[in-house]
Amino acid sequence: MSDAANDTKVRFDPERLTFNEAGLVPAIAQDAETSEVLMLAWMNAESIARTLRTGRVTYWSRSRQAFWVKGETSGHVQELVDLRIDCDRDCLLVLLRQTGPACHTGRRSCFYTGVRDGHEQELMTPQD
């Protein structure tokens, strides 16, 4: 029996993704080695193309309305390992190698607050 995943190769076209009304798609950043979810950001067709072209993960900043090359100013670079598309083509999983903390608060992950027994609990502190 053949492996269907290896039988067909379709050229990736970012325009075939399902973008929201602002032309954006959510992108989940995940450490390729540990599988830890690091952050959620937004990408448009051009930021996806730039990411694939350069290997440096590039998002679209909704607040600044500009491209955001992760680590360009902080040095906390995200290097692309793999890009995956979900089944509905409306969300991306960006597998990457993270240098330093991913969160602007200095924490490894933006998901540093847990909810325990109805209360918020800080699960990690900023890295030095």
Curated annotation (Swiss-Prot):
Family that this chain belongs to: Belongs to the PRA-CH family.
Obligatory cofactor(s): Mg(2+); Zn(2+)
Biological-process GO terms, alphabetical: L-histidine biosynthetic process
Annotated protein name in UniProt: Phosphoribosyl-AMP cyclohydrolase
Organism expressing this protein natively: Roseobacter denitrificans (strain ATCC 33942 / OCh 114) (Erythrobacter sp. (strain OCh 114))
Main location: cytoplasm
Highest taxon, organism lineage: Bacteria
Example of a GO cellular component annotation carried by this entry: cytoplasm
NCBIfam families: PRK00051.1 (NF000768)
